[in-house]
């Protein structure tokens, strides 16, 4: 319902802009005596009236829906925007698309949220030669606020800021709903299809630190869209085709001549690749055979296909070890999947007159893009450009994707801009209807601020990095003497949770567009915005009820029977922070920057610490340590924090443990 209202509103605004422009043009021409009434203008006016009628019905339906109880968490910011949107439309019905700005307040003295629309509206009125101060506008907006269950009071501050104070009973009810029904977002995706293209290593080469960011960011993004109700297809566009397979297959034939009947023990594929490359560069006869193997591969020769599959399988086994360790889920759909579609792609571009021939190459110039696409090489072979065009068409027409997200490093930005522009040019999709976007990211740097390498200057193998992480996290746990209090099983679980959690969080907590410095020392530090700190904080929160002998059943019963009191300023601050979770996730769904979630989880953990230091959850006898009183509403606040943190961790792909 929300999406339909937004879609209809956007179309209405577009129609109104078109009407305005056409009316001005017609008035100008009429003044010259050139034109009668325009049927095009009348048609637009008629459609606009229909849209306004439909939009009003939708708004009324939405208000009815809002009154019904829901098991999902509420996006409070979004609800306040609806309330202030109604007030602004009622106060200034003649303004076209007035600004609607509602944000959480930065300081308690400014309330819980602020509406800062008055200044922008003042500027719009000034352009219409109406001089009204922002403060007067703010007063007018507040007079037109509809009755609602969210706002306790509003205050006008400074030049025209509207400070919004939420109702305590509303916040308390929302926290109770969260505890009873679990952490559930409003359904946003409505089963729209999202394709996330990420990881994408090359067959016959080991995954290295350069694949880390795409794999981690893509997995987390997929989890977020799934949680928001989208149908997500996670694709691994592996490099499993091309001339390099000719030399690998030729080398396989020489080294394991009976490969068709006996499975070859290739073992170290990286070494195998280097051996074949060395021969390819030094031996002309071998190079010729390698090219012959490429031709046979492209014609799907059965023996060559068997060799190709053997090489791919060895790589897949190596990739799987990393994906299993990091809990990554992917469907492999490599370049080979699109081979049979490429001929038709080239023909379609030729038939529409987009292809030019340059030195035997078939190229496509795309408006607004500096570098043309090469869709056929001078030797008749296809390129990455052809493969990516075939992939985007398959995803749009066969998968019927509503959103396609490519999680690939910043260095590929121009390539993807050109591919997307070419797909629009040929008419495959309309960017107003379908989102096709490149989620770029910076490189991983060493502590010397240069590209992360081994001491010998080689690229860091991803498996080596993960193993080093496991070693470092165990050292850290033993340093804290956790091996003396945890069982062997608990210690192992804590080791993997900290190791992989810290590696993922260190990546995701940085703005993805920036390069980031990889440092085990920093990421394993249990102070500051790190996974180590947050995982420890989570286990501490989970232990509060356990140490007070309160089990899950008691907490569930209390959630239904106990009113959550928010009288202490730290209780109120924590309650509001918990309920901001849906608006944080909505922001990430809009801009695709996951570090916002990390910042929020850290803020939630530090806000909890403030609350816990100021508000007794469990009151004990100082001499005996005996529990005298349990403040159950505060225990419920602890439980709500843990529930939101657990869901945040899940989206980030981090597995917390109960004991650490």
Curated annotation (Swiss-Prot):
Tell whether Nucleotide-binding is among the UniProt keywords: yes
Q: Which GO terms describe its biological process?
A: arginyl-tRNA aminoacylation
**Residue span of region Interaction with tRNA:** 529-543
Q: Where is this motif: 'HIGH' region?
A: 201-212
Asked if Aminoacyl-tRNA synthetase is a keyword of the record, the answer is: yes
Record-listed E.C. numbers: 6.1.1.19
Q: Kindly provide the name given to this protein in its UniProt entry.
A: Arginine--tRNA ligase, cytoplasmic
Q: Which organism is it from?
A: Mus musculus
Give the lineage.
Answer: Eukaryota, Metazoa, Chordata, Craniata, Vertebrata
């Amino acid at each position: 319902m929300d999406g339909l209202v937004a879609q209809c509103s956007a179309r209405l605004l577009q129609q109104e802009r078109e009407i305005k422009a056409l009316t001005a043009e017609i008035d100008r021409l009429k003044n010259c005596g050139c034109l009668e009434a325009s049927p095009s203008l009348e048609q637009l006016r008629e459609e606009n009236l229909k849209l306004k009628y439909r939009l009003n019905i939708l708004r009324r339906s939405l208000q009815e829906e809002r009154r019904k109880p829901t098991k999902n968490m509420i996006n409070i910011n979004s609800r306040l925007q609806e309330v202030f949107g109604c007030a602004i439309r009622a106060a200034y019905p003649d303004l076209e698309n007035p600004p609607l700005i509602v944000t959480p307040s930065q300081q308690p003295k400014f309330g819980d949220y602020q509406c800062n629309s008055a200044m922008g509206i003042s500027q719009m009125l000034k352009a219409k030669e109406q001089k009204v101060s922002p403060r007067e506008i703010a007063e007018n907006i507040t007079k037109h606020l509809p009755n609602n269950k969210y706002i306790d009071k509003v205050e006008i501050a400074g030049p025209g800021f509207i400070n919004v104070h939420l109702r305590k009973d509303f916040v308390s009810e929302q926290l109770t709903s969260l505890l009873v029904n679990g952490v559930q977002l409003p359904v946003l995706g409505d089963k729209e299809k999202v394709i996330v293209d990420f990881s994408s290593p090359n067959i016959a080469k080991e995954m290295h630190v350069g694949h880390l960011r795409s794999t981690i960011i893509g997995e987390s993004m997929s989890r977020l869209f799934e949680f928001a109700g989208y149908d997500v297809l996670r694709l691994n566009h592996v490099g499993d085709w091309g001339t390099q397979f000719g030399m690998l297959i030729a080398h396989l034939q020489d080294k394991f001549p009976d490969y068709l009947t006996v499975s070859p023990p290739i073992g170290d594929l990286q070494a195998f690749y280097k051996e074949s490359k060395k021969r390819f560069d030094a031996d002309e006869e071998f190079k010729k055979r390698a090219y012959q193997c490429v031709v046979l591969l492209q014609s799907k020769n059965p023996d060559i296909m068997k060799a190709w599959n053997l090489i791919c399988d060895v790589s897949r086994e190596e990739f799987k070890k990393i994906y299993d360790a990091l809990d990554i889920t992917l469907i492999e759909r490599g370049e080979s999947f699109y081979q049979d579609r490429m001929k038709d792609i080239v023909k379609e571009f030729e038939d529409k007159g987009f292809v030019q021939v340059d030195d035997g190459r078939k190229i496509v110039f795309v408006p607004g893009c500096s570098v043309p696409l090469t869709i056929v090489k001078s030797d008749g072979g296809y390129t990455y450009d052809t493969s990516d065009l075939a992939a985007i068409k398959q995803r749009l027409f066969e998968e019927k994707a509503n959103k396609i997200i490519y999680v690939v490093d910043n260095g590929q930005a121009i390539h993807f801009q050109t591919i997307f522009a070419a797909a629009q040019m040929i008419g495959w999709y309309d960017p107003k209807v379908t989102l096709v976007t490149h989620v770029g990211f910076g490189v991983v740097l060493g502590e010397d601020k240069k590209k992360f390498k081994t001491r010998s200057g080689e690229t860091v193998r991803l498996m080596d990095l993960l193993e080093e992480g496991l070693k470092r996290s165990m050292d850290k746990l033993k340093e804290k003497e956790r091996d003396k209090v945890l069982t062997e099983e608990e210690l192992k679980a804590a080791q993997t949770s900290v190791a992989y959690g810290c590696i993922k969080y260190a990546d995701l907590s940085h703005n993805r567009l920036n390069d980031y410095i990889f440092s085990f020392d920093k990421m394993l530090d249990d102070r500051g915005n790190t996974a180590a700190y947050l995982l420890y904080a989570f286990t501490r929160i989970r232990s509060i009820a356990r140490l007070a002998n309160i089990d899950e059943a008691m907490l569930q019963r209390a959630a239904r029977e106990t009113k959550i009191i928010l009288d202490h300023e730290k209780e109120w601050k924590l309650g509001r922070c918990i309920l901001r979770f849906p608006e944080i996730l909505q922001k990430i769904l809009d801009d695709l920057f996951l570090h916002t979630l990390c910042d929020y989880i850290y803020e939630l953990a530090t806000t909890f610490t403030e609350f816990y230091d100021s508000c007794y959850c469990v009151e004990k006898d100082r001499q005996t340590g005996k529990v005298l009183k349990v403040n159950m509403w505060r225990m419920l606040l602890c439980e709500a924090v843990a529930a939101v943190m657990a869901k945040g961790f899940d989206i980030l792909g981090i597995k917390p443990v109960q004991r650490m």
